[in-house]
Amino acid sequence: MKLLFAFISCLLIFGSSLWSKAEGAKPNVLFIAIDDLNDWVGFMGGHPQARTPHMDALAKQGRNFLNAHCAVPVCSASRASVMSGVAATTHGSYELGPRYEQLPALNDVPTLQRYFKDHGYTTISGGKMLHHNFNGRLVGDIDRSLGRNRSPRPKGPMSRPANWSGAWDWGAYPKADAEMADIQLAHNAAKTLKENFEKPFFMSVGFFRPHVPLFVPPKWFAKYEADKIALPKNPKNDLDDLPKNFLHINDYAVAPTHAEVVSGGKQRSLTHAYLASVSFVDHCVGIVLDALKSSPHADNTLIVLWSDHGFHLGEKQHWAKRTLWEESTRVPLLIAGPGIRSGQPCKEPASL
């Protein structure tokens, strides 16, 4: 949370002299968040088969933080830290609640969007940015909404066993990209980027996949050969050095246990679904980036892309998040645009 908030604060202070050729102009900011995306992207090398051409291209254009980690490995708490610049040890959230506006420690702390709005920016937001959206006293932080829709789900279980949580389902559904909320959001953002604005803008775009349930159209599954999906390495004795109580860390989550996944023969198909979802969201990112390139704002817009936390797919015999292993904490973090040096990955530790 320190890195992003410090960087963006510097935009407001030094933006005119660093990035804009026009006297007095401030840089726009395109702020892209991706839910539950771990290091399974090409430029991070987390999985040898991951296909993410658009994010890979962005990584080459700007600064890629290869050792970036979230503040808390769970959606709501991580996003509260990013949007406030306040550590979880101060704001007190380590789970899916309370809402940002319900945390007493954040009563007088503006969201990132409010901070930009107070400094002369038009704030635009869509999709999943804060976990619980901008509600209550936060409603006025956003000048314009790009929408926050839900993607369709099958009427009943598609791939999951009957005793698993409904969130943990996956498969090639629906048939068309156009039915997916992330695609709709990407096109809304792309359309908005074509417009002219009287003030600089701070546009927040929050994509939901690869968060479970892992439903994406068939074309994204077809990018990977199901029987050739590489599975993460998982030594049988990998947990032998852990305290006994730590072995039950997943018992209180909605995710299945590793034993349930393996005994049910679901590991390869779940891994396939995650990779398909990653390629799908990369396509969504590409729609927005391509629109920016052809827009009147291409030469004066900074791009920040990040994920709220990582995700286990069987590593350390764990699924989902909520651990302090790097599979749960390591995230993509990219900053690109005019004035940002390209081709120089940063390997030093960085915190969202």
Regions found by a protein language model. Give the residues of each.
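Formylglycine-dependent sulfatase
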Residues: 2, 7-8, 20-352
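C-terminal segment of classical bacterial N-terminal signal peptides
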Residues: 12-20
